[in-house]
Amino acid sequence: MGIVVENVSKQFGSFRAVDQVNLEIQSGKLVALLGPSGSGKSTLLRLIAGLEKPDDGRIILTGKDATNQSVQERNIGFVFQHYALFKHLTVRQNIAFGLEIRKAPANKVKGRVEQLLELVQLSGLGDRYPSQLSGGQRQRVALARALAVEPSVLLLDEPFGALDAKVRKDLRAWLRRLHDEVHVTTVFVTHDQEEAMEVSDEVVVMNQGRVEQVGTPAEIYDNPATSFVMSFIGPVNVLPSSSRIFQSSQLEIEHPNVFLRPQDVVIEKSANGTTAPATVTRLIHLGWEIKVELTLDDGQVVNAHLTRDRYDELQLEPKQKVYVKPKDAKSFPLYYSI
């Protein structure tokens, strides 16, 4: 097992940032810690790194109890959101820094640096300074520097948070390919649901210092364990079980709070025995997808997402009368509002 967190808690004054967390991360996996601000994800990452010490519990890295080890003793690579590169050093010198501190032989340092420059697709830029690089390139240098010392665990704290959307998306795909090459046990913190789902092997959803659910992206999305997970992972309509849209459906609704994904709202132009009447109140064109805001006859607002092809079939317009039904939905006894 790469990382084991056993009943770990951490408190700052009266605020309990991490509350009795238990977590196992297999060696070689790429795992996302996902949650809103204040959920404890960054504190948990710092506890694994040794930058914070737990009040209770143990941290086990590659089979050894690391709870009382220093950061240096843990053999961890750490990448922050804002790069933390040395401005007065070239790209090559930044990558070599950790190896030189450890007094590695010069020929080994040179070979490792060139290998990493190629790995992070920065060959030819080794003599540039950080100020001469784009944000995406600087983050690649930070990752190369973290990998230079061949860490047993790589920790990334919102590594793409300071970048614009296009660069962030490109780097996500690149990080996934990089991980598939190096196979280092990697944990990264993010509040971006799409980022977590796209990049990771497993997602750890956190809320108020606790782990709500651990699973693959598909498991987290398709089988959420709690109303919080359902609400936090992707868009959702939250409706009472008494809503008109469920009255004629064949779905089994067990609890009073029903969660309906926009893509699971079926829109028809004519009524049948399982549909409810609704009015189109707003259309939002995103190019690849159309968002449709609907108002049911009972006043409930429901959002639907349509593919471009389905939208072209329906030819919807504002104020148009349509008929809707749920394709799938989940209900929970309690509703946690984010």
From Swiss-Prot:
Catalytic reaction annotation: sulfate(out) + ATP + H2O = sulfate(in) + ADP + phosphate + H(+); thiosulfate(out) + ATP + H2O = thiosulfate(in) + ADP + phosphate + H(+)
Annotated ranges, domain ABC transporter: 3-233
Keyword ATP-binding attached: yes
Entries under InterPro entries matching the protein: AAA+_ATPase (IPR003593), ABC_SmlMolc_Importer (IPR050093), ABC_transporter-like_ATP-bd (IPR003439), ABC_transporter-like_CS (IPR017871), Mo/tungstate-bd_C_term_dom (IPR008995), P-loop_NTPase (IPR027417), Sulph_transpt1 (IPR005666), Transp-assoc_OB_typ1 (IPR005116)
Residues annotated to bind ATP: G35, P36, S37, G38, S39, G40, K41, S42
UniProt keyword Cell membrane present: yes
GO CC, alphabetical: ATP-binding cassette (ABC) transporter complex
Membrane topology listed for this record: Peripheral membrane protein
Enzyme class: translocase
Localization per record: Cell inner membrane
GO MF entries: ABC-type sulfate transporter activity; ABC-type thiosulfate transporter activity; ATP binding; ATP hydrolysis activity
Keywords for the protein's UniProt record, in alphabetical order: ATP-binding, Cell inner membrane, Cell membrane, Membrane, Nucleotide-binding, Sulfate transport, Translocase, Transport
Pfam families assigned: ABC_tran, TOBE
Physiological role: Part of the ABC transporter complex CysAWTP involved in sulfate/thiosulfate import. Responsible for energy coupling to the transport system.
The family this protein is said to belong to: Belongs to the ABC transporter superfamily. Sulfate/tungstate importer (TC 3.A.1.6) family.
Subunit structure: The complex is composed of two ATP-binding proteins (CysA), two transmembrane proteins (CysT and CysW) and a solute-binding protein (CysP).
PANTHER family membership: SPERMIDINE/PUTRESCINE IMPORT ATP-BINDING PROTEIN POTA (PTHR42781), SPERMIDINE_PUTRESCINE IMPORT ATP-BINDING PROTEIN POTA (PTHR42781:SF4)
Name of the molecule in the record: Sulfate/thiosulfate import ATP-binding protein CysA
UniProt organism field: Nostoc sp. (strain PCC 7120 / SAG 25.82 / UTEX 2576)
